[in-house]
């Protein structure tokens, strides 16, 4: 039995969700992968992507799902999925994308990332008859391997802006 709760994100979660997103991004990409983002770029990205003002419309978007996992009142993971926004020539209206799946360092190894991925895939499949899409950083081999195990294949790439810094992302698709 798990010692965490997965539920939809709510307004009351915005401040904690913002802090969790920032912390997890830094732990994963700066500390974990050693990406040397300039401080100004990182802060611009955080404001655009993880501020309460940026997150609020995402948790209320009726075309999306935004779950959090919490343990003892603390957010330990998040999952966001909705209509595909990835820049790929074969993408069609109505197809779905896993937009973000973050698991905090303290919750890794619990199977939570896989559980959230399965929930997201079920939700996406229920909301489209088309392909499912994921954008993943080109250096995150562990995530790529996980997504490949669920039938996703690399079909392209694009530049993902973190402020002025551009990360190289792979586009994965499951038809």
Segment roles from a protein language model:
Residues 73, 77, 111-113, 151:
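Conserved phosphate-binding and hydrolysis motifs of nucleotide-dependent enzymes
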Residues 4, 8-12, 16-106, 117-119, ...:
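Acetyl-CoA-dependent GNAT
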Residues 104-106, 110, 138-139:
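Active-site acidic-Proline motif in GNAT/NAT acetyltransferases
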Residues 109-122, 145-149:
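Conserved acetyl-CoA-binding loop-helix of GNAT-fold acetyltransferases
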């Amino acid at each position: 039995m798990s010692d965490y709760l997965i539920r939809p994100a709510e307004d009351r979660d915005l401040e904690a969700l913002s802090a969790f997103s920032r912390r997890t991004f830094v732990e994963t990409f700066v500390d974990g992968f050693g990406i040397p983002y300039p401080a100004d770029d990182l802060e611009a990205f955080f404001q655009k992507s993880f501020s309460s003002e940026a997150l609020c419309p995402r948790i209320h978007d009726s075309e999306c799902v935004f779950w959090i996992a919490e343990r003892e009142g603390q957010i330990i993971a998040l999952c966001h999925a909705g209509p595909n926004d990835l820049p790929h020539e074969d993408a069609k209206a109505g197809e779905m994308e896993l937009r973000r799946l973050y698991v905090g360092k303290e919750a890794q190894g619990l199977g939570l990332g896989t559980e959230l991925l399965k929930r997201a895939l079920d939700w996406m499949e229920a909301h489209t008859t088309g392909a499912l899409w994921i954008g993943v950083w080109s250096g995150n081999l562990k995530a790529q391997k996980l997504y490949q195990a669920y039938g996703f294949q690399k079909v392209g790439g694009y530049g993902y802006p973190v402020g002025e810094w551009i990360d190289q992302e792979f586009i994965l698709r499951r038809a």
